[in-house]
Amino acid sequence: MTLWVLGLNHQTAPMELRERASFVGDALPRALDSLRNLPNVNEAALLSTCNRTELYAETTNAQMLLNWLEQHRPGLQNHLYQYSDAAAVRHLFRVATGLDSMVLGESQILGQVKDSWSMARTHGTLGNTLDRLFQHSFSVAKHARTNTRIGTNPVSIASTAVRLAQDAFSPLNESTVLLIGTGETIQLAAKHLSEGRVQRLLIANRTHAKAQMLASQHGGYALPLTELNLHLAEADIIFSATAAPTPIVTQSNVESALHIRKRKPMLLFDLAIPRDIETEVGTLTDAYLYTIDDLERAVEENRRSRREAAETAEAIIELQVKRYMDTLQAHAHQAPLRRLRTFGTTTRDELLTRARQQLANGRPAGEVLEQLAHGLTNRLLHPPTAALREAALANNTELVRAAEQLFPEKPGYHHPTLQTTIVKTDETDPAS
């Protein structure tokens, strides 16, 4: 059986294709049930997020997995990557650590990998191999994130702005934040702010229904954009990212708000292009304005820091891949060793029981011991001897060389001529 991963992600497929490839809601457990019924597939797990869909499986037939994927999500073949064994292990470790993410080092993916593992366990498609692999990936991700700065600095405009706001108004649970717009940047800011337990969140948008929807998701209050100036003075922090062609927050608006606030400072983040906030706002006393250019410099510094941390994380992963594969190989070798030991102990017990019975029947101890010794020798040595003879005839030097390593010839020692000794007994010894 070989470990395989088949998948696509943001690097190999556009958004519309990733959406079509995903397994969400009830589709995921149904897919796992289908995979469980495939012949020659021992184990399987599905990782499906907005940026990737990946199938992990232990199987002897990778083509069967490709056929299954084509049947359930047609049209993906030209966008798929596939890895096996050590490459598959390395890929999962990189995914769990955030090194394969659209945002380098993001931590959300680790939770999604854990969800994938949990779902596969629940539906009975996870066995020892994938269970051990996924759990090891969790440890690797934790180790990499603990020992590097791969996830410490924000690398999106929105998250960097929120981090600056937290530094300026700590804690946020004593601050009122006003969000203007409901696009992707504002949605991300709202997510980070709600995680920071902001005291009060106001959301203003031209389409009031969209503001209400975003507000309901994060415990905020929706405002029509026409009432924006009525609420400016309430805001300690403002994030704005709309598609307006001209500024919607003017110098005079902010000046009036500062007057009402009795000069209590305001922090403003203009995350829009073209600008939502007049540049003159930055000249006002007690108003601190950050634009995308200001934030981009901080973001690029953070990205550089993460790239440096990623190099260290990659080295950690390479070491962990080697350790994991060594462990896997050791486990693979344990099965024949267990069979060998079982064969030896079973043979010993069987012949020892017979010897005791013969002694109880009054047979001379010397004869019984001699038969026991010869029986053990013949029974234990017959399988390897026959295998070595066949290997020699087939020119299988690998097996012969292994035997030479196990039983090296000592200096001055000469092998006696191979003879078969038959000990006459009251009954025929099946081991002879």
UniProtKB/Swiss-Prot annotation:
UniProt GO molecular function: glutamyl-tRNA reductase activity; NADP binding
Residues given in the record as substrate binding sites: 49-52, 101, 106-108, 112
Sorted UniProt keywords: NADP, Oxidoreductase, Porphyrin biosynthesis
Pfam families per record: GlutR_dimer, GlutR_N, Shikimate_DH
Pathway(s) served: Porphyrin-containing compound metabolism; protoporphyrin-IX biosynthesis; 5-aminolevulinate from L-glutamyl-tRNA(Glu): step 1/2
Catalytic activity annotation: (S)-4-amino-5-oxopentanoate + tRNA(Glu) + NADP(+) = L-glutamyl-tRNA(Glu) + NADPH + H(+)
Active site residues of this protein: 50 (nucleophile)
Gene Ontology biological-process entries: protoporphyrinogen IX biosynthetic process from glutamate
EC number of the protein: 1.2.1.70
InterPro entries, alphabetized: 4pyrrol_synth_GluRdtase, 4pyrrol_synth_GluRdtase_dimer, 4pyrrol_synth_GluRdtase_N, GluRdtase_CS, GluRdtase_dimer_dom_sf, GluRdtase_N_sf, NAD(P)-bd_dom_sf, Shikm_DH/Glu-tRNA_Rdtase
Annotated site residues (Important for activity) in this chain: 91
Keyword NADP on entry: yes
Domain of life: Bacteria
NADP is among the record's keywords: yes
Residue sites binding NADP(+) per the record: 181-186
Broad EC category: oxidoreductase
Misc note: During catalysis, the active site Cys acts as a nucleophile attacking the alpha-carbonyl group of tRNA-bound glutamate with the formation of a thioester intermediate between enzyme and glutamate, and the concomitant release of tRNA(Glu). The thioester intermediate is finally reduced by direct hydride transfer from NADPH, to form the product GSA.
Homology family: Belongs to the glutamyl-tRNA reductase family.
Function: Catalyzes the NADPH-dependent reduction of glutamyl-tRNA(Glu) to glutamate 1-semialdehyde (GSA).
Alphabetical list of PANTHER family matching this protein: GLUTAMYL-TRNA REDUCTASE
Subunit structure: Homodimer.
Entry domain remark: Possesses an unusual extended V-shaped dimeric structure with each monomer consisting of three distinct domains arranged along a curved 'spinal' alpha-helix. The N-terminal catalytic domain specifically recognizes the glutamate moiety of the substrate. The second domain is the NADPH-binding domain, and the third C-terminal domain is responsible for dimerization.
Descriptive protein name: Glutamyl-tRNA reductase
Species of provenance: Xylella fastidiosa (strain M12)
Gene symbol of the encoding locus: hemA
